[in-house]
Amino acid sequence: MTGKSVKDVDRYQAVLANLLLEEDNKFCADCQSKGPRWASWNIGVFICIRCAGIHRNLGVHISRVKSVNLDQWTQEQIQCMQEMGNGKANRLYEAYLPETFRRPQIDHAVEGFIRDKYEKKKYMDRSLDINAFRKEKDNKWKRGSEPAPEKKMEPVVFEKVKMPQKKEDPQLPRKTSPKSKAPVVDLLGLDAPVSCSIANGKTSNTLEKDLDLLASVSSPSSSVSRKVVGSMPTPGSAGSVPENLNLFPEPGSKSEETSKKQLSKDSILSLYGSQTPQMPTQAMFMAPAQMAYPTAYPSFPGVTPPNSLMGSMMPPPVGMVAQPGASGMVAPMAMPAGYMGGMQASMMGVPNGMMTTQQASYMAGMAAMPQTMYGVQPAQQLQWNLTQMTQQMAGMNFCGTNGMLSYGQSMNGGNGQAANQTLSPQMWK
């Protein structure tokens, strides 16, 4: 190879490299794959290696394939490639290709498409002469390609022209913005009421009427609330209920009783309503209708219980048992004569036969009874004289410092003697 031929090869390679830089030549003319490195120089198209194998199978009379880098090119071959190219060749061989046609990707389908395109010339415009198309239309395609960039530049110019129009658009709402504020103020009605109130005094009158209506509506509610408060018992009246139950009222309570009489009917009813939870405490001072001996001693008759308040507070005689159904009451029970002596010895832990605090714990607040009371016959009827008992109880000391029976105080001094003297058999009738 001479030096002249080496220079020609380098020059041809440079021409092919420039042709591959064109946008249409960057993709295969048949399958549109990227980066074709082969060419069919008699047709004038750049193709991929897969399509190059199919072109070889078509035959040399249809397609002649060369490698861009591996084969040597001649001036005639380079001239054919310059005259056609992928874009111009597809306009000739794909003139009647449907717009919705999708290029195949499978080898078998690609081979069928290539044979239809170049061998059968199925999509080719047969009215055109290929040689005339290469020479004559070569300049036309170049001229057609030259104004194309000018048309592309035109929209850029129009965009520059439209830019000032876009600037004017935001100025329109700025001018109309102060006009739009006026109806907003009218809708709120901030200005109109002020002028009307200054011109005419009717607005203030209407407001006063509205306030009067509100006051008239609120007045019945206040009266109802006053009635409800009046009907409810006051804390003073509620707190005075336990004072009515006091057994030993103080002299100052008389003035309170006179003030209580002046209460209305509603307050009296409320007092009775608040007194209902304390009814069980009154039952402790009530006596049953009759206390009978148990069935084990049918020979002894029943004994009528005391009707006075002090009867329930006094300790029962020996042989009395609790009767079911009567709260806080006991019934007498006959005991043998021999049992009485042991009863006195076991139950009486203090002089004069007084009961100990442990044995009389359920009888808290009860008065001490003399020993002679335990000798009463079971068949006798027990009757208490209310007037005598109240006088005697006034002189007795029931409670000590700790709230329990003060046996020491009652046994010492004249109190103990008075108790033994006052509670004499004269009481029993």
Swiss-Prot record:
It comes from the Eukaryota. It holds the Pfam family ArfGap. The modification Phosphoserine is found at residues 127, 219, 223, 225, 231, 240. It is found in: Cytoplasm. Gene3D superfamilies: Arf GTPase activating protein. Coiled coil: none annotated. Residues 138-172, 253-263 have a biased composition (Basic and acidic residues). Residues 138-181, 217-263 are annotated as: Disordered. Keywords: Cytoplasm, GTPase activation, Metal-binding, Phosphoprotein, Zinc, Zinc-finger. Residues 340-429 are annotated as: Interaction with PICALM. A zinc finger (C4-type) spans 28-51. GO terms for cellular component: cytoplasm. Residues 163-232 are annotated as: Interaction with clathrin heavy chains. GTPase activating protein that acts on ARF1. Can also activate ARF6 (in vitro). May play a role in clathrin-dependent retrograde transport from early endosomes to the trans-Golgi network. This is Stromal membrane-associated protein 2. It comes from Bos taurus (Bovine).
